[in-house]
Every structure is written in structure tokens, then in C-alpha cells.
Amino acid sequence: MAKFITIGYGDQAGYERTAPEIRDAAHAHDERLWATGALMGTAGSPVQVRNTNGEGIMTTPMAYMRSDLPVAGFAVIEAPTIDDAIALVAGTPCSVAHGVVEVWPLKVAPAT
């Protein structure tokens, strides 16, 4: 089965303006994803890391990419196709609570 990385974006305002029964259904959906072995978590504070030409590590305590909504969480899921992965994340809190979820196919590099 193929692996996918998902990035959920959303904020508290969008969450709060979503009906409680929809939020509850989304959290139940997340529980079902957990039960299938999906690796899921909320986003902490990011740190950028650079080591240009291997000449020394430089860090910046902030996200590199910018978006209208903050990153809320990440998941690694398995599905037969990207369409199946989309169907899996369509019921998650970020998808239903005025946020958005990106689905990225994970191309696993062979071990060297």
C-alpha cells in the first residue's frame, strides 16, 4: 500500500464556528484512523535547519513556508491510491472545520 503525508491547516476560530456534532464526528473519524495504524499528531513549534555545503548548522526558530492558516498537525497514512487517501482525510477536523488538508504521496527512498 502507498504511504502519504498529510498536513492539516486550521485555526481555533474555524474550529469553534463548526457545529459540535460535526467536530465530534471528525474526532471519531480521527480515532478510526489511529486504529488503522495512522501516525498522527499536532504541530509543535518548527525550527528551520540549514547546513550549506556542510559548513555549519544554522537554525531559525520559525516555519519556512507561510500560509493563511497555521499548521495544525501531520499524519502518515496508508492507502491504495491518492484518491483513497483523500477520502480518508476528508472527514478529519481540519477538513471539516474551515481548514484544509494537503495530501502528499511519500516516495520512500531505497536503503543505501
Residue spans for each PLM region:
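Conserved, structured core segments of small domains
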Residues: 1-112
